[in-house]
Amino acid sequence: PGVLEAVARDLEREDFRTFRETGYLLRATYTLDMAEVSASLTEMALAFGRQDLAEKLAGLDRHWRNAFDGDGLMRADSEYYEGNRWNYSFRPVRHQEERMALCGGKEGYVNLLDRFFGFTHPEDVSARFEGFNNETDMEAPYAYHAAGRRDRLCRILDTADRQVFRASSGGTGRGGIPGNND
C-alpha cells in the first residue's frame, strides 16, 4: 500500500511521463529498464487490486523495442555507461522471442552473440565481451540459453570458471567476484 502510493507518485515524475508519452528516454538502457519495471509494477498493481495503476502502466513494457536499432543491437545514438551498445544488447528481456526477431530470428541473434563472444571474427575486438569483470557483460552469456545454444553458454561459463574464478589459474579463487568495485 505505501509502496503503491510511491509508485503512483513516480508515475507523475517528468522522466516517467516522458517515457509514457514518447516511449523513449535519454539513454537506451534507461528505456529498457523502464519497460521492464513497468511490466513488474503492472503485475504488482494487479496483485494488490490497484486497477487504476495497472491501467496507467498497461502496455508500457512494449517500449523495450525503442531501445534497439534495426540491426538488433541497442541504439547506436545512445550514450552508455561502462560499455557500449554491444555490452548492453544481450540483457534478458521479458519478450525474448520478439527480441531475437529483431535480429532476424534465433540464428541472427546467435550470430551477433558469436561475434560478441569472439566465436567468429576473433580479430575484431571493438565489440567484444569484456569478461566477468564488467557488470554490463555478466548477464550476456545467458542470452545463449534463450536462443537454445546451451553448449555456447556452458563453454563460456566453463572457461570463466577455469580462468577467472579459480585461484590455481590466477583467478580470484573460491567466492571471488571479479570487477565488483561497486
Residue ranges of predicted features:
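Active-site core of glycosidic bond-cleaving carbohydrate-active enzymes
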Residues: G2-R62, N66-D182
